[in-house]
Design a protein with these regions (language model features):
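Long, contiguous binding/interaction regions
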Residues: 1-76
Length: 76
């Protein structure tokens, strides 16, 4: 089965803290919905740009798109 990487982007000087905080909520959602994550983390690309992400099976695509509204999604 294909895995999908969902990405949420944050901009500005507080982007790192926002992506870390958002990741905590993503993990809570995965636990509540009983969705297994293959990877979940955040990345700091510059002082003004960071993102948080999760990698899950593609069968959860519609559920996550509808409830969490990711900014981007890629095949992982």
């Amino acid at each position: 089965m294909t895995n999908i990487k969902f990405v949420w982007e944050f901009f500005g000087p507080d982007s790192k803290n926002l992506s870390i905080h958002h990741l905590a909520h993503l993990k809570e959602f995965l636990s509540f919905e009983k969705i297994k994550s293959f990877d979940s983390s955040f990345s700091v690309e510059s002082v003004n740009f960071s993102y948080s992400y999760i990698v899950v099976q593609s069968k959860y695509l519609d559920n996550i798109k509808l409830k969490l509204k990711p900014h981007k999604a890629f095949k992982a």
